[in-house]
Amino acid sequence: MDKINPDWARDVPCRNVIIYGFCKKKTEGCPFKHDDDDIATPTSTPKVADTVPAPSGVIQQPSKISVSSLPSLNSQPSSTAPTSAPNATAHTGSKSQVPKFNAKASASFTPMSKAADGTQETQAPYLESPVAGSPGPILKAGTPVSFMQPNIYSTTPVPSPASMAMPNVVMPPNDMGSPDLGLQQQSHMVNLDGSIQQNYQERPNVLMRDSSMPLTMGTSGSRPMLDQQIHSISGLSNTSGPQPPGLLQSMNGASMDMGLPMNLRYPTIYPPTHSILQYHLYAPDPPPQLEIALKENERTPRMLFIPNDLREELVKRNLASLQLFPSGGNLPHIVKDYFGLVPLDFHQRSSVKDRYKKHKNSLYKVFSNVDGRIYLLRRIHDVNISDPTIISKTFQKWSKIDSSNVVALKDLFLTTAFGDSSLGIVYDYYPNATSLYEAHFVNYPTVEVTEDLLWSYAVQILNGLREIHNTNGVNIGDLDCDKIILTGKGRIKISAGAEYDIMNMCCPEDNEDDDNEEKLRKRNFVDLGEILFKLASKMCNCHGKDVANLAQVSEKLKNLIKSLAFEQLHDYVNVATIIEKYIGLDVVFKVMEAQQTYSEYAENVLSRELENGRLFRLICKLNFIFGRVENRLDINWSEPGDKFVIVLFYDYVFHQIDPNTGKPVTDLTHVLRCLNKLDAGVEENILLVTPDELNTAVVSYKKVKELVDKTFRAMTL
């Protein structure tokens, strides 16, 4: 066509408006049809747009609107209702009005052939013709209607069918996150038809029913819009014709039965970032009745790694070592050579906090600036020491004690970092260690007490007392369940030993007969007997101070408790005498055998982890040289190159495919066998095949090892 016919073009929509939303040649005489030809410029009072009557029997598909122009909650009820006449073609009321597309009024344009984001189109059953006076589109009898089924996991609000049926209502962008939705937003609606407002006036009961819905269902922007969609569709249940059966059920089930999250932007199925390690993510050991009998040469994966119970215990200790708690007070950031104070006063009773000459004390986990290790700091409040040699002498005496059953002293100093003159005593830190009082009387579940455990406690405490008593000028003072800590299964240590000596030197006026060293040592044995008696009473579940009530305890242990707790020892007694007379070497050997067995077990586990560490270093070396970006264009890593063998070997170890099923092979035994042979450099030959099975190579593990070492050294030079 050389020249466009204006009479023909005036009924054709301008393509510029459809694509760009406006036509820049409109003022220059564009002959095509523009939607805003007859619409006046918008002012403060919106005007009614021109409408044209809908032809009879033509389906009017609503224009999809943007998120910003979606109607608010309860903004428009659904009023489409089928009639009993199946062949009705149109309603008998006023003519339905079809809006013209206004690019300026529409925030965005969405093709009608594609569903909105986060929705799925499903075909509903055939609807009959609508009731007269309905503001919805004119539907021909037997015409399938496409409803938008919302995706409850989408963060984009989805328009409801009721809102799609009334495209002539232009909504301003509303605050989707505000809970104050309701009739107030209806006052901001721009009515371009007039019939819609009349419909609200004719059906006040529907408006009041919709506006009475709860508006505080959630805080996210998608929840109120989804409630609006559910309620708009639920209005179809008031009609008298056939209903779309699956739509309402799926909508209600999506928000109620499936548990719609309150804020769809953050999925609720993921654990929070601060959650601790979940041990169930590891494959647990099967129950004993389900274990398969293995041959002598067979192994299971759990036999190649650290046992689950030991792994969990070690992981918990590491977690406790690095765990931080809020201080809850004005703690200093640095105390002498230590920083990062973490309070550890969990179960300290008032009698325990004031036990050092009526001075309060506090426990902290600290990090050393000297060696970076974690230590335990005990602070004794408000201690005045005029002679600094008292601290140095006490530290020199206690630093000589080296026993597996005594917590080692690491540092001793005075500090004013807490706002007063405090005494700081630093010991070795044992993560997850608890006192005997906490382990057997406070924590749940409590540690079970047995007679073998009591004998083990007695031998270990006597071993620690032997080391303390053999050091001249060292006394531990009172011994109770709070001073003895449980560091592992059946392993205990005597803690808080240096506090007694230094506080006696600082406050000599409070000493009565504490200067008698023999009485102090005998008092330690009496305290040991009282500890054993408390634990034995808990085991037998009996009360009172009569040893005869301990029915589940052997006579030998009863005799030991009676001799120690009720001061039936002679004045000059030592550890060797107690062991020889009341315990016996058979008990000592039994405890020593248990400790030896556990040491061998721990070394065996460590040896397996040592092999795993060797293989891990080998895997790291392979990954350092394999798959690097700069090697993609290197001819040495291509099929003709000499380093292509490393690529084939890597695929041979980790990327094998089962020829029968076509699935990847995850054989841990195959990986360990290949890596061990590679690390040893055996002469065994292997057949390496390319993925397309066109090229093969026969090479030994020794050659592959030499090639890997050569490539790694060349890369690190």
UniProtKB/Swiss-Prot annotation:
Biased amino acid composition, Polar residues: 91-100
Protein name per the record: PAN2-PAN3 deadenylation complex subunit PAN3
Record bears the keyword Endoplasmic reticulum: no
Subunit organization: Homodimer. Forms a heterotrimer with a catalytic subunit PAN2 to form the poly(A)-nuclease (PAN) deadenylation complex. Interacts (via PAM-2 motif) with poly(A)-binding protein PAB1 (via PABC domain), conferring substrate specificity of the enzyme complex.
GO CC term (a single one): P-body
Chain positions covered by the region annotation Pseudokinase domain: 323-585
Residue stretches in coiled coil: 586-624
The family this protein is said to belong to: Belongs to the protein kinase superfamily. PAN3 family.
C3H1-type zinc-finger residues: 8-37
Renumbered residue ranges of the record's region Knob domain: 625-717
Pfam families named among the record's database cross-references: Pan3_PK (PF18101)
Biased composition (Low complexity): 62-90
MF annotations from Gene Ontology: ATP binding; poly(A) binding; zinc ion binding
Domain of life: Eukaryota
Function: Regulatory subunit of the poly(A)-nuclease (PAN) deadenylation complex, one of two cytoplasmic mRNA deadenylases involved in mRNA turnover. PAN specifically shortens poly(A) tails of RNA and the activity is stimulated by poly(A)-binding protein PAB1. PAN deadenylation is followed by rapid degradation of the shortened mRNA tails by the CCR4-NOT complex. Deadenylated mRNAs are then degraded by two alternative mechanisms, namely exosome-mediated 3'-5' exonucleolytic degradation, or deadenylation-dependent mRNA decaping and subsequent 5'-3' exonucleolytic degradation by XRN1.
The UniProt record lists the keyword Repressor: no
Gene Ontology BP annotations: mRNA processing; nuclear-transcribed mRNA poly(A) tail shortening; postreplication repair
Localization of this protein: Cytoplasm
UniProt region (Disordered), positions on chain: 37-100
This protein's UniProt keywords: ATP-binding, Coiled coil, Cytoplasm, Metal-binding, mRNA processing, Nucleotide-binding, Zinc, Zinc-finger
Gene it is expressed from: PAN3
Domain remark text: The N-terminal zinc finger binds to poly(A) RNA. Contains a pseudokinase domain. The protein kinase domain is predicted to be catalytically inactive because some of the residues important for catalytic activity are substituted and it lacks the equivalent of the binding site for a peptide substrate. However, it has retained an ATP-binding site and ATP-binding is required for mRNA degradation, stimulating the activity of the PAN2 nuclease in vitro.
Binding sites annotated in the UniProt record for ATP: R378, D428, Y429, Y430, P431, N432, A433, T434, S435, D482, K483
SUPFAM superfamilies: Protein kinase-like (PK-like)
